[in-house]
């Protein structure tokens, strides 16, 4: 049998909804939108790193980072 602790008693309300699932899609479309935006962000960073995205007046010198 599990031992009761003060921390467990404090955290118990956070786990009271365990096993309950909201009907329908819930916030899945919103999560998809944020995942797509994050993908665009990562692609922009990758293009800047590969110098395939040229920004006017913005020089990237990776040797200045000290690696």
Swiss-Prot record:
A GO cellular component annotation in the UniProt record: plasma membrane-derived thylakoid membrane
Entry-linked Pfam families: PsbH
Any one GO molecular function term: phosphate ion binding
HAMAP family cross-referenced by the UniProt entry: PSII_PsbH
InterPro entries, per database record: PSII_PsbH (IPR001056), PSII_PsbH_sf (IPR036863)
Lineage of the species this protein comes from: Bacteria, Bacillati, Cyanobacteriota, Cyanophyceae, Oscillatoriophycideae
The organism's place on the tree of life at top rank: Bacteria
Organism in which the protein naturally occurs: Picosynechococcus sp. (strain ATCC 27264 / PCC 7002 / PR-6)
Subcellular location: Cellular thylakoid membrane
Keyword annotations: Membrane, Photosynthesis, Photosystem II, Thylakoid, Transmembrane, Transmembrane helix
Subunit and interaction comment: PSII is composed of 1 copy each of membrane proteins PsbA, PsbB, PsbC, PsbD, PsbE, PsbF, PsbH, PsbI, PsbJ, PsbK, PsbL, PsbM, PsbT, PsbX, PsbY, PsbZ, Psb30/Ycf12, peripheral proteins PsbO, CyanoQ (PsbQ), PsbU, PsbV and a large number of cofactors. It forms dimeric complexes.
Name of this protein: Photosystem II reaction center protein H
Gene designation: psbH
UniProt keyword Transcription, yes or no: no
Protein task: One of the components of the core complex of photosystem II (PSII), required for its stability and/or assembly. PSII is a light-driven water:plastoquinone oxidoreductase that uses light energy to abstract electrons from H(2)O, generating O(2) and a proton gradient subsequently used for ATP formation. It consists of a core antenna complex that captures photons, and an electron transfer chain that converts photonic excitation into a charge separation.
Membrane topology (UniProt): Single-pass membrane protein
Disulphide bridges: none
Residue spans crossing the bilayer: 29-49
């Amino acid at each position: 049998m599990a031992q009761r602790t003060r921390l467990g008693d404090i955290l118990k309300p956070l786990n009271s909804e365990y096993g309950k699932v909201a009907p329908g899609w819930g916030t899945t479309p919103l999560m998809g939108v944020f995942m797509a935006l994050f993908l665009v962000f990562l692609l922009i960073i990758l293009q800047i790193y590969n110098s395939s995205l040229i920004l006017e007046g913005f020089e990237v010198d990776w040797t200045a980072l000290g690696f």
